[in-house]
A protein has these predicted regions:
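A helix-boundary/kink motif common to multi-pass secondary transporters
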Residues: 52-53, 83-84, 135, 169, ...
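Transmembrane alpha-helix termini and helix-breaking/packing motifs in multi-pass membrane transporters
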Residues: 42-50, 102-104, 156-195
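Juxtamembrane intracellular "pre-TM" segments in multi-pass secondary transporters
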Residues: 4-22, 209-247
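C-terminal ends and interior cores of transmembrane alpha-helices
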Residues: 93-107
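Helix-loop junctions on the cytosolic side of multi-pass membrane transporters
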Residues: 128, 132, 185-188, 192-222
Length: 248
């Protein structure tokens, strides 16, 4: 039985590289990314159904990505403030909330931005937990599995989104779940309703991720100081040859 010490923290024993915790992380990541990409297709379809101006469609992705940029200096602090499985649970719950807001009256762009906040908070947790769960020599392989699974989920998610907005599939969802009773009558809304369940399932899987036992010193929330530290770290990475490769 092997033990790993990373960043001063001793992880629990694990018998092999593919332990239960890593399988759970992969499953949660796949489901969350699958829903992210299916939602993009469904949200575009919703804008089309609502006869929104053409300029709104490209803004969907912008509203999603802007959270990564605006919150980059602080999401890492949030991810280290509690067990990362819980962080991922909160993040997926926030994504599900964004979907529900999109269904029940909120502007699609604003609702999609909330989904983006959840995605931005999710990223540092999904990568950070690997350093707590696995030994350093296994991290490259682990990240390869995560990235490969993410690529697969992107392809399948876009496909799933296209399937869910089909009239026969979406119409079936509207009928089976009696969505008209709660004011949901559009095919795109039925698709988003189904995606809420995927996010919910991903959040439930997050709860099954084992607590690695890693605890970090509590950091006071100082937005300006955190922004300065983030900027300095960013410059440091750009000056490092390997860091340049990673960022580019």
């Amino acid at each position: 039985v092997e033990r790993a010490t990373l960043n001063g923290f001793i992880n629990t024993d694990f018998p092999s590289f593919m332990n239960r915790g890593f399988y759970t992380i992969m499953a949660a990541q796949f489901l969350s990314s699958l829903a992210d990409n299916a939602l993009l297709i469904a949200a575009i379809a919703l804008l089309t159904d609502l006869q929104a101006p053409d300029w709104m469609t490209p803004l969907l992705k912008l509203f999603f990505v802007v959270s990564y940029v605006c919150l980059a200096a602080w999401v890492g602090i949030f991810a280290d403030s509690m067990p990362k499985g819980r962080v991922m649970f909160i993040s997926n719950s926030l994504k599900a909330l964004g979907c529900l807001l999109m269904l029940f009256g909120s502007h699609p762009l604003l609702a999609y931005a909330i989904v983006g906040v959840g995605a931005a908070a999710y990223s540092p947790a999904k990568y950070g937990i690997l350093t707590e769960l696995l030994p350093a020599e296994k991290l490259v392989v682990a990240n390869g599995w995560i990235e490969g699974l993410t690529v697969a989920s992107i392809i399948l998610g876009v496909t799933l989104g296209g399937v869910l907005i089909r009239p026969d599939v979406a119409g079936g969802l509207l009928e089976i779940f009696h969505l008209e009773a709660v004011g949901l009558e559009r095919f795109a809304q039925a698709a988003i309703f189904a995606i809420v369940f995927i996010y919910t399932f991903a959040a439930i899987v997050n709860l099954a991720i084992p607590d690695t036992g890693a605890r970090y010193p509590k950091q006071d929330f100082r937005p300006i100081e955190s922004l300065k530290h983030f900027w300095q770290s960013n410059l440091l990475l750009w000056r490092d040859p390997l860091g340049q490769i990673s960022l580019s």
